[in-house]
From Swiss-Prot:
Belongs to the insect chemoreceptor superfamily. Heteromeric odorant receptor channel (TC 1.A.69) family. Or49a subfamily. Residues 67-79, 161-204, 299-304, 395-404 are extracellular. The atypical heteromeric and topological design of the odorant receptors appears to be an insect-specific solution for odor recognition, making the OR/Orco complex an attractive target for the development of highly selective insect repellents to disrupt olfactory-mediated host-seeking behaviors of insect disease vectors. Odor-evoked OR currents are independent of known G-protein-coupled second messenger pathways. This is Odorant receptor 67c. The gene is Or67c. The keyword Transmembrane helix applies. It is found in: Cell membrane. Expressed in olfactory sensory neurons in the antenna. GO terms for molecular function: ionotropic olfactory receptor activity; odorant binding. Odorant receptor which mediates acceptance or avoidance behavior, depending on its substrates. The odorant receptor repertoire encodes a large collection of odor stimuli that vary widely in identity, intensity, and duration. May form a complex with Orco to form odorant-sensing units, providing sensitive and prolonged odorant signaling and calcium permeability.
Length: 404
């Protein structure tokens, strides 16, 4: 079976399968414009908006809980505990809002990538698609596992713990606790019916936040992987071109095609920035605070809380690293085009060819990148800055809390 699969060309939709399927579980259909069933599309949209209305009501409850907790130093620990969850929720909200606001850009981006996708197995081997897909799958699997592990442990640990204590350890009462610290305008634990309705309501809200947070980044990973594959193919074509001196017309036609191809890839990068720039800005600002507050919880809590928050900490750090890694990979792949052009046997070609090649090299010196507003292009240097900033906040918070 594996051999048969390896001998089959991969479609673009197969590469997009994970984010598309996960998005549909919360009602977001990226390819709704291709749907032939308007009723199904309408139901998806109703489910999506109803879910986000419910989710944002829960976020308001978290914000009220946070505000009430910071009024007294005795409850400041509770405020610190809920703060990273609020940050995660706001980033998920903003990412989904960016997807909705930039839906036309997203459709255009995905359609262009699908049109550029190599269709035959032979062509995909030329593009080294299997190598890019292998790395992409590993990243997607790791991040998906961590993100779902975080939302699952926070959502279901209190119920599992209470069930074990009540059913197996002989406790007289079932502890009606929730996985998230939320203020309610009523007593949400006064009886079993209300408690379980609210419990599953919160669990759905947590799942929706996790999927909105996860899928926006998975979509970014798939898109950047595809763009890097195209930049890499351009580099290989440039390096392998023979540049025969007696084939000037063919050389110029080849270079014109490469320049157009390169320009198309750069435009795709601009679409990515239009779609992601503001959400990534909020993501990095929140990530510093999230990692700080989570680290504080890990150093100041019980073993069971430490385990839960360690999963959250790993999720936050891996998410930031993943975005920075792909930002760095995009920069490297686009810069490689200029190096490949210079490594050609261009000295055998005509002056017109060399002039065009020079323009291509000059353009490639400004690398394609992911650029949040006011931030430098995202790279692994950005990751180090985020971690450094988080540690500074953590040290300040720890010192302030200890002194009081």
């Amino acid at each position: 079976m594996e051999t048969a699969k390896d001998n089959t060309a991969r479609t673009f939709m197969e590469l997009m399968r994970v984010p598309v399927q996960f998005y549909r579980t919360i009602g977001e259909d990226i390819y709704a414009h291709r749907s032939t069933n308007p009723l199904k599309s309408l139901l998806f949209k109703i489910y999506l908006y109803a879910g986000f209305i419910n989710f944002n009501l829960l976020v308001i409850g978290e914000l009220v809980f946070f505000y009430n907790s910071i009024q007294d130093f005795e409850t400041i620990r509770l405020a610190i505990a809920v703060a990273p969850c609020i940050g995660f929720s706001l980033v998920a909200d903003f990412k989904q809002a960016a997807m909705i606001r930039g839906k036309k850009t997203l459709i255009m981006l995905l359609d262009d990538l699908e049109n550029m996708h190599p269709k035959t197995l032979a062509k995909q081997m030329e593009y080294k698609l299997p190598d890019f897909e292998k790395t992409m799958k590993r990243v997607i699997n790791i991040f998906t596992f961590l993100c779902l592990a975080y939302t699952t442990t926070f959502s279901f640990y209190p119920a599992i713990k209470a069930s074990v204590k009540f059913n197996f350890l002989g406790y007289d009462t079932f502890d009606r606790n929730f996985g998230f610290l939320i203020w309610f305008p009523f007593d949400a634990t006064r009886n079993n019916l209300i408690y379980w309705i609210m419990y599953w309501d919160i669990a759905h809200g947590a799942y929706l936040a996790g999927i909105a947070f996860l899928c926006a980044d998975l979509l970014l990973v798939v898109v950047i992987t595809q763009i890097c594959m195209h930049f890499n193919y351009i580099s290989m074509r440039l390096e392998d071109h023979p540049c025969n001196s007696n084939e000037d017309k063919e050389n110029i036609e080849f270079l014109i095609g490469i320049i157009r191809y390169h320009d198309k890839c750069l435009k795709l990068c601009e679409h990515v920035n239009d779609l992601y720039s503001f959400s990534l800005l909020l993501n990095f600002l929140m990530a510093s605070m999230q990692i700080c507050f989570i680290a504080f919880q890990v150093t100041e809590s019980t073993v069971e809380v430490i385990i839960i928050y360690c999963i959250f900490l790993m999720t936050s750090m891996v998410q930031v690293f993943m975005v920075c890694y792909y930002g760095d990979t995009l920069i490297a792949a686009s810069l490689k085009v200029g190096d490949a052009a210079y490594n050609q046997k261009w000295f055998q070609c005509s002056k017109s060819y060399c002039t065009m090649l020079k323009l291509l090299i000059m353009r490639s010196q400004k690398p394609a990148s992911i650029r949040p507003p006011t931030f430098p292009p995202i790279s692994l240097v950005t990751y180090m800055k985020v971690i450094s900033m988080s540690y500074q906040f953590f040290a300040l918070l720890r010192t302030t809390y200890s002194n009081n």
